[in-house]
Amino acid sequence: MSGVWVFNNGVIRLVENPNQSGGVSTQSHGRRNVLVYLPTGEAVSSYSSLEQILRSLGWERYFSGDSDLIQYHKRSSIDLISLPRDFSKFNSVYMYDIVVKNPNSFHVRDFN
């Protein structure tokens, strides 16, 4: 069984396979998340815009044998950012990974 358990008015039910959309992570109850670049307030809407921002922060593309991933590394650290090649699979897990590795530059916000 996969899905999300929802408790509402004393009743618990399983909602199977909640929908997700690219670049915007859909949480239970219709909440969506976006990755925001703090200096400009811009919501990241594509990998090309994200790559420009990451490059300006010192991140470089890391080419590995995995064709399903886009990866970035920083020479000054051991950190590696791994993202799905398909932007429609970019969700809050990947967003928070970017935030943890760039805490003063990115933030995940609810978007309704």
Swiss-Prot record:
Coiled coil: none annotated. InterPro entries: FPF1 (IPR039274). Transmembrane segments: none annotated. Signal peptide: none annotated. Expressed in leaves and in some parts of the flowers, mainly in the sepals. GO terms for biological process: regulation of flower development. Belongs to the FPF1 family. Overexpression of FLP2 results in shortening of the time to flowering. PANTHER family: FLOWERING-PROMOTING FACTOR 1-LIKE PROTEIN 1 (PTHR33433). Modulates the competence to flowering of apical meristems. This is Flowering-promoting factor 1-like protein 2. It comes from Arabidopsis thaliana. The gene is FLP2.
